[in-house]
Amino acid sequence: MKLLLSFALLGLVACQEKCDSQNKYCFPNEVATWTGAVEYCLKNGWKLAVVNSEAKQMKIEGLAKNLPEFKNGKVELWIGASDQTKEGHFVWIANGQPIEYANWLPGKPDNKDGKEHCVHLWYEKAKKLNWGWNDVVCTSKRRFVCERKKK
């Protein structure tokens, strides 16, 4: 039991070490499916990020520039939006609210092959993709951004 608790605490500490204490964003050093990312954030007292304003988008972009992947020219991060319940109707998983602010890449969302229902932020220098949103297959694995829940 002590060992299990120690691992749980290590996971929480690792998440917090990557967080901005003022705005409370976290970039766990993990890769997961979209559902796995939702579960990871919830398990640690967070939520998969709700990017419902340009200010939040800019804050997350600024923080993500500190990730090692950014220096390599490519970052993909799950955020908490999906249209799994109703095709074409993207909502925030944390509160069920429809997306009002969005930063879709040109031509997105496109639900390629009828299988893309989860949203990620995508930065890729070589392709000139500058933090736009893209719909992708939910079972693909990538890093993610959690946001501390309001108390």
UniProtKB/Swiss-Prot annotation:
Transmembrane annotation, as ranges: none
GO molecular function, one term: carbohydrate binding
Record keywords: Disulfide bond, Lectin, Secreted, Signal
InterPro entries associated with the record: C-type_lectin-like, C-type_lectin-like/link_sf, C-type_lectin/snaclec_domain, CTDL_fold
Tissue: Expressed in female salivary gland. Not detected or low-level expression in female midgut and fat body.
Required cofactor(s): Ca(2+)
UniProt subcellular location: Secreted
Domain C-type lectin, residue spans: 25-147
Disulfide bonds: C41-C146, C118-C138
Signal peptide location: 1-15
GO cellular component, one term: extracellular region
Factors inducing expression: Blood feeding does not affect expression levels.
Purpose of the protein: Salivary protein with carbohydrate-binding activity. Binds to D-mannose, D-galactose, D-glucose and maltose. Agglutinates host erythrocytes. Probably participates in mosquito innate immune responses to prevent microorganism multiplication in sugar and blood meals. (Microbial infection) Binds to the surface of and agglutinates Escherichia coli in vitro.
Protein name per its UniProtKB record: Salivary C-type lectin 2
Organism: Aedes albopictus
